[in-house]
Amino acid sequence: MKALRLRVGIGMFCAVFMCAQVSGQSSSLQKGEKLKSFRWPDGKKAAVSLSFDDARLSQVDNGLALFRKEGVKVTFFVQPSGVEKRLAGWKQAVADGHEVGNHSLTHPCTGNYEFSRHNALENYDLAMMARQLDEANKEIYKQLGVKPRTFAYPCGQKFVGRGTEVRSYVPLVANRFLAGRGYLDESANDPLVCDLAQAMGTGFDDLDFLQMKKIVDDAVQEGRWVIFVGHEIGERGYQTTDTQALEALCEYLKNPATGVWLSTVEEIASYIQKQREDTNPPASKK
C-alpha cells in the first residue's frame, strides 16, 4: 500500500512538473511571438533617437555642424529662454530638419535641487503645470514657427504637489503631445507596450562610444527603441556628450549592418502609434 501511494505521489509530482514545464515553454513561446509581432520599417531590428535638452548653446555651436556632416536628424527639447540666446542658430536647426520639442517654460524640478529651489514641483499644482506646457508651446511657435509635438519632462520628474496632494502630470502631456520622454530611466522602450506619454529616456552624457554601443546592441537584441538624452555637446565632461563618441555613434547607427532605424522622437513615436492603430483599429460606431 505504501509503495502504491509512493508511486501515485511520484506520478502526480511528475505530472505537475511537466505541466509547469509546458506552461513555461508556452509562455516563452508567446513572448517570442509577441516580440516578433512588431515590425520596424525596412527590416530594421531596433530604433534609436538622439535627443538633447535645455537649448544649451553648445547644441547649436557644436552640434549642428556635426549632425550636418553626419546627415543625422535629432530632437532638441527646448525652453524659450534658451532659444532666445541663439535664435538664429535655432532657426537654422529647424531649417536643417531637426525636431524641436517642448521642455517646459521654466524647467520646474524638485526643490531638492538647489537650482530649482524657487521653482519646485512640490509647490506646483496641475493648473500651474498646464500653463508651463501651453505657454512654452506658444513661445516656441512665436520664435521658430513650429508647434512641438513631443515633450521632455524636466529632470525626468512627472509629479506636482506634496504628500496626499501629489498628482501626476502625465495626463496633461498625453492630452497635448504625441509623446513625452523621461530621463535616466533603466530600460529602452518596448514598442508593443511602452506608454508614449512617458517613454523612457537613456542618458548618454559622459559616456564613451563603447558604452553607447552596448546600449544600442542590447536594444537590437530585444527589438526596442532607445531615446538617448544629452545636454552639452563638446569635450567629455559633466552633462556633456563627447563629440568624438557622438560622431562614432552616428557612424555606427548609420551602418546598415547595425540594423537600426535612426530618427527623431516624433517620427518614431508616430510610427509606433500607427502600428498600434493598424493592429487594433478602433471599433466602428453603429
Question: What are these model-derived regions, one by one?
Answer:
Residues 64-71, 83-105, 142, 173-174, ...:
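Acidic (Asp/Glu)-rich catalytic clusters
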Residues 29-42, 74, 82-85, 177-193, ...:
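C-terminal domain-boundary segment and adjacent tail
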Residues 9-21:
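Bacterial N-terminal signal peptides
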